[in-house]
């Protein structure tokens, strides 16, 4: 009997494998048949897998919302530091390089825009004063050049006036100032053109 049992065991095992294969084939055929028939019904009703996937998506979205709320709580909580904590954080020495130290220097400079505006206005006033002084000096130079040009042309007439009996040294100054102020009838550009192009 033991030989029969030992010979029958491999047959049973082989038959068992065949049966398992048949069952798998049946399941596969049944699944494909049901999927063919369910294809037409799927358009009207979602399958259980799809419903399960949608449920998972909703669960994921709810957990995302919960995470977002918890993240917001931790962020808002961490923003509230007391003065002691701030002082300790400021006292921590960080690694410094040339680049980071230059960047830190630029960030530590608080620019007072009102002060900068006042300095700009003050600078503009200085420039206006210098420009006025320069234009006065330029105007004086041009007027003197205009007088010299006039004396070149009318110098003999002025000498004849100096020889007149009622002519005094004070009269010469008055005459020179009158001729000099006569340059005011020209604008600066015209006067410059006259004097520079003699």
UniProtKB/Swiss-Prot annotation:
Residues 31-48 have a biased composition (Low complexity). GO terms for biological process: ribosomal large subunit assembly. Pfam families: Rsa3 (PF14615). It is found in: Nucleus, Nucleolus. One of its GO terms (cellular component) is preribosome, large subunit precursor. The keyword Endoplasmic reticulum does not apply. Residues 70-84 have a biased composition (Basic and acidic residues). Keywords: Nucleus, Ribonucleoprotein, Ribosome biogenesis. Residues 1-84 are annotated as: Disordered. Its main location: nucleus. Residues 14-27 have a biased composition (Basic residues). Associates with nucleolar pre-ribosomal particles. Belongs to the RSA3 family. PANTHER family: RIBOSOME ASSEMBLY PROTEIN 3. Required for efficient biogenesis of the 60S ribosomal subunit. This is Ribosome assembly protein 3. The gene is RSA3.
């Amino acid at each position: 009997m033991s030989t029969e049992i030992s010979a029958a065991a491999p047959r049973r095992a082989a038959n068992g494998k065949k049966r398992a294969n048949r069952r798998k084939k049946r399941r596969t055929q049944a699944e494909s048949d049901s999927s063919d028939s369910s294809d037409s019904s799927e358009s009207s009703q979602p399958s259980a897998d799809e419903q399960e996937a949608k449920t998972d998506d909703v669960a994921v979205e709810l957990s995302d919302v919960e995470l977002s709320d918890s993240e917001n709580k931790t962020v808002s909580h961490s923003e509230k530091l007391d003065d002691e904590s701030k002082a300790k954080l400021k006292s921590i020495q960080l690694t410094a390089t040339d680049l980071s130290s230059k960047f830190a220097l630029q960030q530590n400079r608080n620019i007072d825009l009102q002060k900068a505006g006042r300095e700009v206005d003050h600078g503009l006033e200085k420039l206006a004063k210098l420009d006025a002084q320069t234009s006065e000096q330029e105007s004086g130079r041009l007027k003197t050049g205009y007088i010299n040009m006039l004396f070149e042309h009318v110098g003999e007439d002025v000498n004849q006036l100096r020889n007149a009996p009622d002519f005094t040294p004070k009269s010469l100054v008055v005459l020179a100032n009158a001729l000099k102020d006569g340059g005011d009838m020209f604008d600066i550009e015209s006067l410059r053109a006259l004097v520079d192009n003699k």
